[in-house]
């Protein structure tokens, strides 16, 4: 019999210390990585439940194991809430990650060797959109599109490439692009050549759910997302569609299970159900509106301080700071800011002369700081400190001063009060 009083602290102090150290790091560091966020205690409660014990291969009502009557309720709640949240007629909540959701779409719609039009990783795309080091770039013939000199998606060039190469699938979405994507224009191009339009909305799913960023679901044949990032749920994946195509839905379900996964993670699916319910609340829209306000406030300060922002601004939760021409690499900026308890990630920028391991850019996002309660005033003060360090990254006195400011602000705005 298992005793409910069992705990990690008494049994495994080494592991417990690592967990406690990470908890303290999150409380004492300002998180500016655009893909990170803080999930709610309700989501964590679901993930720590006895649902983790249950195998449930298959789908609600069609399982390969007995005893699934209650996990069927959990998964159905998640499915129906996801559909309501995004205006979809189909949802699959089983993918373990965004990358696995994307893999399932490739498997459902394509054959190895088929041509795919996807956003260049160096211009803001994602590994799974055709990077040569990823399965997508290894198994499929990838034609990359990118942004123009103004930092905007070049739809004229996209259409030219589509007409020339006739891809079977076009991919919309990004991991480092701060503008608005014209989903309707992409669908128009896809229809012109008879291609599928697949949108990976992982980065902006929360903004879309709240109505502060255009929804691709009415335009794309299929849409994927992560459930963390701006959605602020558990780490996981999601597939959606409003194509009203039962054959497509069956292909997508089969590509997830049994095509790419076995048993779903029912405790994570419960966490997704909670997060979708939270995202349907009015305060979630207020949160997402503030995410964008904070991002715009940060961009304003960066530009005032003489820093170049790719695309010239932001219309979502992120910005890409271009350090080309400065005596500072993305890797060095990442390390210097980290020393002051500000967490960012180095990132390639368009026409980057440096390797992806060094880079000439820094990607910054506002979902996590907004979740803590930061508004424009805090976002602007924080950006001033970031610029102070970028201006003088090798000055320990500047780093120590900023670290003190960061610790004081973190104490004022705890992640979990």
Swiss-Prot record:
Q: Which GO terms describe its molecular function?
A: glycine hydroxymethyltransferase activity; pyridoxal phosphate binding
Gene3D superfamilies assigned: Aspartate Aminotransferase, domain 1, Type I PLP-dependent aspartate aminotransferase-like (Major domain)
Reaction(s) catalysed by this chain's protein:
(6R)-5,10-methylene-5,6,7,8-tetrahydrofolate + glycine + H2O = (6S)-5,6,7,8-tetrahydrofolate + L-serine
What is the name of the gene encoding this protein? glyA
Essential cofactor(s): pyridoxal 5'-phosphate
- Binding partners and assembly: Homodimer.
Q: Which residues carry this modification: N6-(pyridoxal phosphate)lysine?
A: 229
Q: Please identify the protein, giving its name as recorded.
A: Serine hydroxymethyltransferase
Q: What is its EC number?
A: 2.1.2.1
Q: Where is this site: Plays an important role in substrate specificity?
A: 228
Enzyme type, top EC level: transferase
InterPro entries, per the entry: PyrdxlP-dep_Trfase, PyrdxlP-dep_Trfase_major, PyrdxlP-dep_Trfase_small, Ser_HO-MeTrfase, Ser_HO-MeTrfase-like, Ser_HO-MeTrfase_PLP_BS, SHMT-like_dom
Q: Which organism is it from?
A: Shewanella denitrificans (strain OS217 / ATCC BAA-1090 / DSM 15013)
Role played? Catalyzes the reversible interconversion of serine and glycine with tetrahydrofolate (THF) serving as the one-carbon carrier. This reaction serves as the major source of one-carbon groups required for the biosynthesis of purines, thymidylate, methionine, and other important biomolecules. Also exhibits THF-independent aldolase activity toward beta-hydroxyamino acids, producing glycine and aldehydes, via a retro-aldol mechanism.
């Amino acid at each position: 019999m298992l005793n409910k009083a069992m705990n990690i602290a008494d049994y495994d102090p080494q592991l417990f210390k690592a967990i406690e150290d990470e908890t303290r790091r999150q409380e004492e560091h300002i998180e500016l990585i655009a893909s990170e966020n803080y999930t709610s205690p309700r989501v964590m409660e679901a993930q720590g439940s006895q649902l983790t014990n249950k195998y449930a291969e298959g789908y609600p009502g069609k399982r390969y194991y007995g005893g699934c009557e209650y996990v069927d309720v959990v998964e159905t709640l998640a499915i129906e809430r996801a559909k309501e949240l995004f205006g979809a007629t189909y949802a699959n909540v089983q993918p373990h990650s965004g990358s696995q959701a994307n893999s399932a779409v490739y498997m459902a719609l394509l054959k190895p060797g088929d041509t795919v039009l996807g956003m260049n990783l160096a211009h803001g795309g994602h590994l799974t959109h055709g990077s040569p080091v990823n399965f997508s770039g290894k198994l499929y013939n990838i034609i990359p599109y990118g942004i123009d000199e103004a930092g905007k998606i070049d739809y004229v060039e996209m259409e030219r490439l589509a007409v020339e190469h006739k891809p079977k699938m076009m991919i919309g979405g990004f991991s480092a692009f701060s503008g608005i994507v014209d989903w309707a224009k992409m669908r128009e191009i896809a229809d012109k050549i008879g291609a599928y339009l697949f949108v990976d909305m992982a980065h902006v799913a929360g903004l879309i759910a709240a109505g502060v960023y255009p929804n691709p679901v009415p335009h794309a044949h299929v849409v994927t997302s992560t459930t963390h990032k701006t959605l602020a749920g558990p780490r996981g994946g999601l597939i959606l569609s409003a194509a009203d195509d039962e054959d497509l839905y069956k292909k997508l379900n089969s590509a997830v299970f049994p095509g790419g996964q076995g048993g779903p993670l029912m405790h994570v699916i419960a966490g997704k159900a909670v997060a979708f319910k939270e995202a349907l609340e009015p305060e979630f829209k207020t949160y997402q509106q503030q995410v964008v306000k904070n991002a715009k406030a940060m961009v304003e300060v960066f530009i005032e301080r003489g820093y170049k922002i790719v695309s010239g601004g932001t219309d979502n939760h992120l910005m890409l700071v271009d350090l080309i021409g400065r005596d500072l690499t993305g890797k060095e900026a990442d390390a210097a800011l980290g020393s002051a308890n500000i967490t960012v990630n180095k990132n390639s920028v368009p026409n980057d002369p440096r390797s992806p391991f060094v880079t000439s850019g820094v990607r910054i996002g506002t979902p996590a700081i907004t979740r803590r309660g930061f508004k424009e005033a805090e976002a602007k003060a924080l950006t001033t400190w970031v610029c102070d360090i970028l201006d003088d990254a090798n000055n320990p006195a500047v780093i120590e001063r900023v670290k003190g400011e960061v610790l004081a602000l973190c104490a004022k705005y705890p992640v979990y009060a």
